[in-house]
Each structure stands twice: as C-alpha cells, then as structure tokens.
Amino acid sequence: MKVISSIQELRDQLRGQNRTAFVPTMGNLHEGHLSLMRLARQHGDPVVASIFVNRLQFGPNEDFDKYPRTLQEDIEKLQKENVYVLFAPTERDMYPEPQEYRVQPPHDLGDILEGEFRPGFFTGVCTVVTKLMACVQPRVAVFGKKDYQQLMIVRRMCQQLALPVEIVAAETVRDADGLALSSRNRYLSEAERAEAPELAKTLARVRDAVLDGERDLAAIERRAVAHLSARGWQPDYVSIRRRENLVAPSAAQIEAGDPLVVLTAAKLGATRLIDNLEI
C-alpha cells in the first residue's frame, strides 16, 4: 500500500485507473470502517482510502483538537485490507490557502437534524468530499448508513452536480450489545459505555411502535426523548423521516408504506452519539 499526502502524487499514481473505489474517512479506524473497504472492493478496483480530519466540518466548541488521530495503527489496518493507496494529506496539502469556495447543501437537507445542531457541518462535509472526489476521481465511493443524513446529502450532491461517482451505502456495524461503532465511543467512561446501547434500543422501540400501527409520530418521538432524558441522556432529537428525502412523513405516506427511518442524536456525559434505524 502506498501512503501519499500530495494531491499531484496521488493523481500521478491513479492515472489511467477507471474503476477506482473510494472510501473517505477521518481515521481512528474501527471494524465499521474496514467493512467499508471490503464493500468498496466488491464495487471497484483499486480501493483508495483517505484519512483527513477536516477542520471545516467542526464547530468552534467541538472536538477537532482532541479527535483521535492514530495514523500508524490505521495504516497497519488498511494494509491488511489490501488497500491500494491511502491518501493522508496534511491540512496544508488540502488547504494550501484559505478555502474560500464552499459547497453548501440545500436548506431542506443541510439545516435539519444534524444541520440544526451543528451549523455549517454539512457545508464542511460537502466541500471536503467534493475536493477529495476531484483528487481521487473514483467511479464508486462508499459511505456508511451510520451517518444517514450525510449519505443522503452526498448522494444528492453527486446527482445534482453531475459528478460521475456512484454512491454505495454500507450497513451500520454494531457491537454485540447493539451500539453502533464510532470513533467517538472511546470517549465514553466505563459506566457510559454500559448505558450507550440504550440509544439503539430506543430506536428499536420507535420502529416497533410505527410497525405496530401507531400513527401519532410526534407522540412516539416525545416518548423516546423522555425515556432517554430519564436515563441521564441529553437528546438533541429523535425524529421519524422518509428515507428518500428526510422529510417528515404525512399520515397518507405512512399508510401507503413509504420507507421510513428514525434518526437520533444525544449526549451521554460529554460524548455526543448519533444513530438511526430504518423502519
């Protein structure tokens, strides 16, 4: 595996490749990330991964400085997955001058849910993903359903900007107790880690309520928020949306069997966790 930080060197290395499968990450790789590499291999060859902690998608009071950076361990994991190139640029490589041009998602997708609680987050994501796509020029890129809203936004962005990249969605990987794998799980104390699976269990109860025929979605959401709050969580939202566009469904759409998803974000202690479950 070649480890490259220069954009020009990356382009030189990938020249002539027309079936590249790309997996962008921020590093601190776990089994969830590695499953993305394996899925990428099913859709293209060679597989290119990137590791870049993107300052643009962190707010002023978020964890950019303490976000775990484990490059050497990540390199060893990617080598075992037979990744062809790891693109690991420095901030100077990616942003040699101030990034004045930004890619901003539409308000209906970018300013709801995560976008409401993390202003500017998806503009940072779309900007860096677009720039990475321009550097790698993949045929396929793999994104996890764990970041469901991000997946929807990137997919729509590629469609509307006519980027010649197929976006492949990967299922969320979970620990045996149901907790979705996340680099931020390492922030949890022992007691918090024991409590953390309750987030996925809460989503399962929401799903079951909808599948059992309950139609007052707002009441289901309020019940879930109250349940988490009573257990010491600080929920930002529990929200049932249409999978297609993350719009809140109407009663008629629910009855018609529109595919739904329930999404949540909540703090446990100082750690903010997100999760979702398709219904």
Curated annotation (Swiss-Prot):
Sites where the protein binds beta-alanine: 57
Highest taxon of source: Bacteria
Keywords: ATP-binding, Cytoplasm, Ligase, Nucleotide-binding, Pantothenate biosynthesis
Binding annotation for (R)-pantoate: 57, 150
Pathway where it operates: Cofactor biosynthesis; (R)-pantothenate biosynthesis; (R)-pantothenate from (R)-pantoate and beta-alanine: step 1/1
Catalytic activities: (R)-pantoate + beta-alanine + ATP = (R)-pantothenate + AMP + diphosphate + H(+)
GO term, biological process aspect, one: pantothenate biosynthetic process
The keyword Nucleotide-binding is assigned to this record: yes
Cellular compartments annotated: Cytoplasm
EC number of the protein: 6.3.2.1
Record keyword Cytoplasm present: yes
One cellular component term from this protein's GO annotations in UniProt: cytosol
Pfam families on file: Pantoate_ligase
Residue sites binding ATP per the record: 26-33, 144-147, 173, 181-184
Main location per the UniProt record: cytoplasm
Gene Ontology MF annotations: ATP binding; pantoate-beta-alanine ligase activity
Gene3D superfamilies named among the record's database cross-references: HUPs, Pantoate-beta-alanine ligase, C-terminal domain
Active site: 33
Classification via PANTHER family: CYTIDYLATE KINASE/PANTOATE-BETA-ALANINE LIGASE, PANTOATE--BETA-ALANINE LIGASE
Binding partners and assembly: Homodimer.
Stored HAMAP family: PanC
The protein's role, per its UniProt record: Catalyzes the condensation of pantoate with beta-alanine in an ATP-dependent reaction via a pantoyl-adenylate intermediate.
Additional remark text: The reaction proceeds by a bi uni uni bi ping pong mechanism.
Family recorded in the similarity comment: Belongs to the pantothenate synthetase family.
Name of the molecule in the record: Pantothenate synthetase
The species this protein was found in: Burkholderia thailandensis (strain ATCC 700388 / DSM 13276 / CCUG 48851 / CIP 106301 / E264)
